[in-house]
Amino acid sequence: MVVWIRGDRLHAETLQWARRHVEELERFGVTPKLAVLLLNDDPVELETQRRYVSLKAKDVRSIGGEVEIYELYKEPPERREAAALRLIERLNNADDVTGVLIQKPLPPYIDEGRLFERLSPIKDVDGLTPENKKRLVAGFDLDRDILPCTPAGILELFRQYQVEVRGRDVVVVGKGTLVGFPLSIMLMQMDATVTTLHALSKDRAYYTRKADIVISAVGRPPELYGDNPWRLTGDMIKEGAVVVGVGGKVDPATKRWYFDVDENSVAEKASYLTPNIGGVGLATRARLVKNLIITTYMVLTRVTSPRLLSL
């Protein structure tokens, strides 16, 4: 019988931890404040990102923090990147802003690298600036570093549910800079044997059927994408595999969610499985709150490394 890897306990414990730190920060006259940049005007991406951001904002406000959302997708495409760069510079210098989230994925005509190079690493709540990426590659600390939220959330769930990755064959479907790529690096550092699949990988099911752990982070459900769609089904895994579903998109017409993993068929064969609702999403949100607390202390103390903090 499948064990469901749920994120509710991790989420609740993290928010409780964060509230204690917000009270401590109040003694110094500091309130965590998250600035969110929305840049993608693709209908599916925009509807999905709005859902995600509303939940993230709810969490931050629930711990006593503040959130400001900048709807840069309303800018004309030819001016959007320049507007984002100007805003990032302003947020870097804003004393009341302690964390900045550039919501991904970005539209293809925006240079992602330029945005994250401009962003201050001490306000980078997604761990995607060059400085934070270097720290991840050099050897990450799950408890102390500013890490990409979804990969870190997944590893925290594995720790909570005692899912061992050392020495196991892990397939990560998707190589995006937000989830697949950093997660593959982190798993290799934990001595897993990692295969990372992407849009040009041939016969992806060949690899997923052999894996001890399958992590699906694509976000191209067949209901919404005719070009290179993806869904992991029960016939694409081996008996007893651990399966983690990350990708999900909202149909802007029906407001319905569609996910990477066919939950019902996969549950018949998997030993551990994250539910599409209440699994990785909650863990991701928990990590964002944790990262915001870390960046708030970094802004307060002006330290350049989170490992210099005692939290």
From Swiss-Prot:
<dbReference type="GO" id="GO:0009086">
    <property type="term" value="P:methionine biosynthetic process"/>
</dbReference>
<feature type="binding site">
    <location>
        <begin position="174"/>
        <end position="176"/>
    </location>
    <ligand>
        <name>NADP(+)</name>
    </ligand>
</feature>
<keyword id="KW-0368">Histidine biosynthesis</keyword>
<dbReference type="GO" id="GO:0004488">
    <property type="term" value="F:methylenetetrahydrofolate dehydrogenase (NADP+) activity"/>
</dbReference>
<comment type="function">
    <text>Catalyzes the oxidation of 5,10-methylenetetrahydrofolate to 5,10-methenyltetrahydrofolate and then the hydrolysis of 5,10-methenyltetrahydrofolate to 10-formyltetrahydrofolate.</text>
</comment>
<dbReference type="GO" id="GO:0035999">
    <property type="term" value="P:tetrahydrofolate interconversion"/>
</dbReference>
<dbReference type="InterPro" id="IPR000672">
    <property type="entry name" value="THF_DH/CycHdrlase"/>
</dbReference>
<comment type="similarity">
    <text>Belongs to the tetrahydrofolate dehydrogenase/cyclohydrolase family.</text>
</comment>
<dbReference type="Pfam" id="PF00763">
    <property type="entry name" value="THF_DHG_CYH"/>
</dbReference>
<keyword id="KW-0486">Methionine biosynthesis</keyword>
<keyword id="KW-0560">Oxidoreductase</keyword>
<keyword id="KW-0378">Hydrolase</keyword>
<keyword id="KW-0511">Multifunctional enzyme</keyword>
<keyword id="KW-0554">One-carbon metabolism</keyword>
<dbReference type="InterPro" id="IPR046346">
    <property type="entry name" value="Aminoacid_DH-like_N_sf"/>
</dbReference>
<dbReference type="GO" id="GO:0000105">
    <property type="term" value="P:L-histidine biosynthetic process"/>
</dbReference>
<dbReference type="InterPro" id="IPR020631">
    <property type="entry name" value="THF_DH/CycHdrlase_NAD-bd_dom"/>
</dbReference>
<dbReference type="InterPro" id="IPR020630">
    <property type="entry name" value="THF_DH/CycHdrlase_cat_dom"/>
</dbReference>
<dbReference type="InterPro" id="IPR036291">
    <property type="entry name" value="NAD(P)-bd_dom_sf"/>
</dbReference>
<keyword id="KW-0658">Purine biosynthesis</keyword>
<keyword id="KW-0028">Amino-acid biosynthesis</keyword>
<dbReference type="GO" id="GO:0006164">
    <property type="term" value="P:purine nucleotide biosynthetic process"/>
</dbReference>
<dbReference type="Pfam" id="PF02882">
    <property type="entry name" value="THF_DHG_CYH_C"/>
</dbReference>
<comment type="subunit">
    <text>Homodimer.</text>
</comment>
<comment type="pathway">
    <text>One-carbon metabolism; tetrahydrofolate interconversion.</text>
</comment>
<dbReference type="GO" id="GO:0005829">
    <property type="term" value="C:cytosol"/>
</dbReference>
<protein>
    <recommendedName>
        <fullName>Bifunctional protein FolD</fullName>
        <ecNumber>1.5.1.5</ecNumber>
        <ecNumber>3.5.4.9</ecNumber>
    </recommendedName>
</protein>
<keyword id="KW-0521">NADP</keyword>
<dbReference type="GO" id="GO:0004477">
    <property type="term" value="F:methenyltetrahydrofolate cyclohydrolase activity"/>
</dbReference>
